Regions:
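Membrane-interface extramembranous regions
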Residues: 1-143
Length: 143
């Protein structure tokens, strides 16, 4: 069971970091100081950078071995928001946009894998499954 949990944790960390890299590769060249003073036609670069920072923080925490369900929910939810945001932004032409942008296609695939991995971590990080709930019973220490 620990090997499976470790493998799922590695996949989740890699998916979070790869998603971060793909989104920053797209967003950083599109950021400019003039975007702060003028009207913005595309706000995605401003959204991708904080999402990338959040995914890096989640990946570091998962890599360090923190076993919190909230952490798994945060990682999976961030990836799900990025995944759902793509068709919402492009609308009916999402399939055409996905076919024409290989970076976006890679990001969508990695985000889907990451969502599944973080859902697996959510399952594995149940307090009873790791024996963490046993320490909350104060009567067991008095025997």
């Amino acid at each position: 069971m620990q090997r499976v949990e470790r493998a799922v944790r590695i996949v989740a960390v890699q998916a979070a970091l790869l998603t971060t890299a793909l989104h920053l590769l797209w967003a950083v060249p599109r950021l400019s100081p003039s975007m702060l003073t003028e009207s913005v036609a595309d706000s995605r670069p401003f959204l991708f950078v904080p999402a990338a920072v959040l995914l890096i923080a989640v990946a570091v925490a998962v890599f360090r071995g923190y076993r919190y369900r909230r952490l798994s929910t945060l990682g999976g939810g961030t990836l799900a928001a990025l995944l759902v945001g793509y068709p919402l932004y492009h609308g009916e032409s999402a399939a055409d946009a996905l076919a024409s942008e290989p970076l976006a296609l890679a990001a969508v695939v990695v985000e889907a894998v990451g969502i599944v991995a973080f859902a697996g971590l959510y399952y594995f990080h149940h307090p009873d499954r790791l024996g963490l709930a046993a320490g909350t019973n104060k009567n067991a220490d008095n025997d």
